[in-house]
Design a protein with these regions (language model features):
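N-terminal metal-binding scaffold of metallo-dependent hydrolase/deaminase domains
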Residues: 1-41
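Catalytic metal-binding/acid-base residues of hydrolase active sites
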Residues: 9, 63, 119
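Short, flexible, glycine/charge-rich loop motifs used to bind or transfer phosphoryl groups or to couple energy/partner
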Residues: 11-13, 37, 48, 104, ...
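Short, glycine/charged-enriched secondary-structure capping and boundary segments
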Residues: 18-19, 72-75, 129-131
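Conserved beta-strand segments of alpha/beta enzyme cores
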Residues: 29, 44-45, 133
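Active-site gating loops and adjacent loop-to-helix segments of metal-dependent hydrolytic enzymes
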Residues: 66-98, 135-138
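Active-site loop-helix segments enriched in His/Asp/Glu that coordinate
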Residues: 90-141
């Protein structure tokens, strides 16, 4: 079990807790959120952060397998031109490396759940090993 505290804790179940305490089990699942009324007392093993603790973020629209194409497709060509460019310049190996980088960036920025639009199975293995929970939405071109 671990305990965390911060200047403010946002639980999404009421107002922020001033110097509250979050208790998690060993895998990080929240067991409880304690309202100390702002009167936090020192405790052995309590990890205090001089900031805020917030719930994880949800990214509801992502294209992991296209991460390697950032900045490579010009705008203003319409949907048909966009799809043509995607199909003609994508490289599966480069895309896998870029998708792994994007997955790590998302996690480091606080994303815990992601809806990923995909055209192939190129990112499926990455998603099974990620610390982010993914929902894959298949787009058929």
């Amino acid at each position: 079990m671990k305990q965390f505290s911060a200047q403010f804790i946002f639980t999404n179940c009421g107002p922020p807790l001033k110097r509250g305490v979050i208790t998690t089990d060993d895998d990080g699942t929240v067991i409880s959120a304690e309202d100390t009324g702002g009167e936090l007392k020192e405790r052995a093993g309590l990890e205090f952060h001089n900031g805020i603790i917030i719930p994880g973020f949800v990214n509801c629209h992502c294209h992991l397998e296209l991460s390697g194409l950032v900045g490579k497709i010009p705008s203003g060509k319409g949907l048909g031109g966009f799809i043509y460019d995607i199909m003609s310049i994508r490289d599966r190996t480069e895309s896998s490396i870029a998708a792994l980088r994007a997955d790590r960036m998302l996690f480091n920025e606080g994303v815990v759940l992601c809806a990923d639009d995909c055209n192939t199975d190129a990112t499926f293995e990455l998603k099974t090993k990620s610390r982010i929970k993914y929902i894959s939405l298949l787009e058929v071109l």
